[in-house]
Amino acid sequence: NTTGKPEYELNLEISRRLYQELQTRGYEVVMTREDNETAISNKERAELAVREKADIFLRIHANSSENPDIQGAMTMVPSEENPYVGELSAESSRLGQCIIDSYCETTGMLNKGVQYYDDMTGINWSQIPVTIIEMGFMSNAEDDTNMADLEYQSLMVQGIADGIDDYFGNVRE
């Protein structure tokens, strides 16, 4: 990546800001980690979401590629054929679509859409609608520079929060 910011730092920065934004909008939010020292497995994260009676499970990530020209954002969800959580595919897809469309519309990030993955433990342990947002490619100079910029991060957070509003049918002011 060009900015030198590690993915785990970016993910936590955005997650913290999103936490504040969603609380401001009236959502109850549970974070699976609030620092970079917390070690928590994907299974434990999914179990926490169930224990807290969460309605959705959103995982915040940034992408990387061997090819520095690849850029854009996407969401990842289970397919209907997923042997573990196929029954979550339709609602997870709707969640992923709401979030990625709003995120890309707000940030101007290239929209790579909803992608189906059945080999991600971050998805396969879930018991509620789940999506992973890959916010951009840290291996792409433009995406990485944008994602490290505080003003751009505000757009990222707004886009994700607006997508969650869209999913729940909440009208924005």
Regions found by a protein language model. Give the residues of each.
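Active-site-proximal helix/loop segments of hydrolytic enzymes
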Residues: K5-E173
